[in-house]
Amino acid sequence: MGVQYKLLRRIGLAVTASIALMGSVQASIVTTVGGSTGTVATGSAGNDVIGSVFGYFGSQLFADGPLRVEYTYLGKEAGDTNSFLVLGNLQFSTATSNYGDTANELVLAPGLLNFAFGANQNTPSVINGFNPGTSGVPNFFVSFYDQFGNLGALTGNSGVIAFDDGGSPADADYDDLVVRFTVSAVPEPTTWAMMLLGFAGIGLVAYRRRSKLALG
């Protein structure tokens, strides 16, 4: 009985540590680096996909820790055939993609998200990390969802990336290809190790209990 108690106590400590580690991972979010704040244009040159919302121009998207990112195609209003790439691979095209199409990226360490937009081509015209803050050239706008699902928050775990292909005439309405991004936590290796330790301990206790019943 004393041995089982000690094992259960160790399992409890392992599970507690796992939960604590997972909590710290879940606190990781995507943030913006650089750029300036403002609102997408209104009027005839307004955004036809997300409307006029507050957000960031010329900013880069940075992951604070290990994350899984899901990108969702929301739509476009553009004459050119624009593209969205993840890890250098074509994922969305305004010629073929449909609302709700998804793509994923796994981020294993803090750093820039690895996506790019192509202006009337399937190769990058603007890459996250080199997003200019001037209009008239390919660039993108970022806005975050708040807890109620409204765009315009300063930061968060979900938002939109809206592309301006810099086409002529330059309208800076950022609806030439729009995607939503949603991030979720990825447990670090130490977390998985703790969880496996806990499961192994539970299995050992169950095995010892069955052995005693068989002997009895």
What positions do the PLM features span?
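Short hotspots in intrinsically disordered terminal tails
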Residues: M1-G2, L213
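Short, threonine-centered small-residue motifs that mark membrane-proximal processing/anchoring sites
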Residues: V3-L13, A17-I19, G23-I29, V178-V205
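Extracellular distal adhesion/interaction modules in secreted or cell-surface proteins
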Residues: S28-N157
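Extracytosolic secretory-pathway proteins
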Residues: L154-G166
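Extracellular carbohydrate recognition
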Residues: P169-V178
